[in-house]
Amino acid sequence: MKKSICLFIGILFLLLSVSANDAYTKVSGGSILPLSKTKNENIKMEKEEINFTLYKDHYDINVKFYFKNYGPTETIEVGFPQWKHLQPTEDDFYYFKSKVNDVTTNFTVKELEKSEPLDEGMVITKWYIRSVTFESNEITTTEVEYSAPYGVYGISESADYLFGTGATWKDCIDEMIIKIMNTTDDVWINAIRIDNSDLGNIIRENNTIVIQKKNVYPKIESEIFLELEIGR
């Protein structure tokens, strides 16, 4: 009962403002992008499914991307960024997995000697890299899964996901589905923020919140931010 009430409260305050100075993300991830760092004008992200699973002492994220190649078949290196806010921390993912077309794939981890600036107060510290073949006029799926410690937001805690790196593909993200599942009565969702934008269609089912958005044009720093209160 306590958890359901808190989910309801979270929906009431979904548009709470968050600033980079208040938030301290220890480690998080983001949408995959072509490592050329230039916008790919042929391959479009048709859909992105982002699944948060909240536990008492950490959270898991599983993300599935659906791409369609409107140009000729091509194989490119794509990178999944690991990022944080500018704070003295050595935190890392507890684990990381990846798939292409539902098949588990190997990846290369690129440790950065010097962090790459992403935006004011945000830096990329590591890349998870793999080669993906995008067949012409076909849908290619890629999937990542990782586990991370909660970040800090004032006296509260936070969970984050950076979807702004999805801006490096053709046009907009046609559809974005965000699913937040709370597994414990020890975690309360106080607020959800998605890049100062309208949250689209919201569905609440028991201990799960589902948000559906269409035609998303992210900025490179666009993120999903959950403000949480955790009982100790």
Language model features by range: what are they?
Residues M1-S4:
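Positively charged n-region of N-terminal signal peptides that target proteins for export
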Residues S19-R232:
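Lumenal/extracellular ectodomains and adaptor appendage modules
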Residues F8-L15:
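Bacterial N-terminal signal peptides
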